C-alpha cells in the first residue's frame, strides 16, 4: 500500500474537510475459485463470487452534488451501519464525495444487499431533498427517471454499482488506497485522513465516523 498497511501510521494536527461542489490471516482474501455469476443490475457488471469482497461505485444521476449536505451523507452512513450491525454486509473501506461514493464490501447476498442499500438511501435522500425544498435538484432527478421505472417519480442513483471482484490481498490494498486517495487526487485535501467522509482515519488508527473491518489480512 502507499501508506504502511493501508494507512497504519498516525497523523497529527488534522484538519477535517467535507465534500463541496466542484479476516486476521483467516480473513484474508480467499484463493481464486470457480465463479458463480449473479447479475447485479441492468449493466454488464456482475458479482462473480460472494466469497470475495467487491469494489463498488454508486453515482448520483447527472453527477448532481447531493452530498455537499452533511445530513445527506449521514443517511448513507446510517444505512451502512444498520446493514453491518444486522450481519447483512461487511464494509472494508469507503469514501463519499459530493456526487458519488466508492466502497468495498462483502455479503452472502451482495447483489441483494447493495440493491436494498441503494433503494433505501434513494427514498430517504429524496425525502430529505423534498423537505429542504431543493426544487432544482428534484426536477433533474425527475427528468432523468428511467422510463421503465413506472413505480416512482424520481431516480436518485444511476443504474448499476460496477462491482469489481477483489481476488488478492494486493488488489485489496490497491483498491483501499484508491478509495482513500480519491479526495487527494481531486485536490480537495492534502492527506487522506483530512477527508471527513472516508475510512482513511480508521486505517490510520484514528476514530472514524462508522466502523469498518480493517482486519481483513
Regions found by a protein language model. Give the residues of each.
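Short catalytic/metal-binding and nucleic-acid-binding patches
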Residues: 4-217
Amino acid at each position: 500500500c502507499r501508506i504502511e498497511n493501508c494507512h497504519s501510521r498516525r497523523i497529527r494536527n488534522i484538519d477535517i474537510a467535507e465534500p463541496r461542489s466542484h479476516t486476521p490471516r483467516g480473513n484474508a482474501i480467499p484463493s481464486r475459485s470457480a465463479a458463480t455469476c449473479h447479475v447485479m443490475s441492468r449493466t454488464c457488471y456482475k458479482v462473480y463470487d460472494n466469497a470475495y469482497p467487491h469494489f463498488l461505485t454508486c453515482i448520483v444521476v447527472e453527477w448532481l452534488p447531493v452530498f455537499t449536505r452533511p445530513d445527506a451523507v449521514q443517511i448513507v452512513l446510517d444505512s451502512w451501519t444498520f446493514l453491518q450491525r444486522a450481519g447483512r454486509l461487511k464494509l472494508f473501506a469507503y469514501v463519499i464525495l459530493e456526487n458519488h461514493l466508492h466502497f468495498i464490501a462483502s455479503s452472502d447476498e451482495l447483489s441483494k444487499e447493495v440493491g436494498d442499500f441503494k433503494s433505501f438511501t434513494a427514498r430517504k435522500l429524496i425525502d430529505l431533498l423534498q423537505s429542504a425544498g431543493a426544487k432544482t435538484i428534484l426536477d433533474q432527478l425527475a427528468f432523468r427517471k428511467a422510463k421503465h421505472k413506472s413505480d416512482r417519480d424520481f431516480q436518485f442513483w444511476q443504474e448499476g454499482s460496477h462491482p469489481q471482484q477483489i481476488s488478492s490481498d494486493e488488489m485489496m490494498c490497491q483498491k483501499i488506497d484508491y478509495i482513500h486517495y480519491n479526495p487527494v487526487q481531486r485536490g480537495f485535501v492534502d492527506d487522506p485522513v483530512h477527508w471527513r467522509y472516508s475510512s482513511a482515519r480508521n486505517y490510520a488508527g484514528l476514530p472514524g465516523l462508522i466502523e469498518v473491518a480493517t482486519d481483513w489480512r
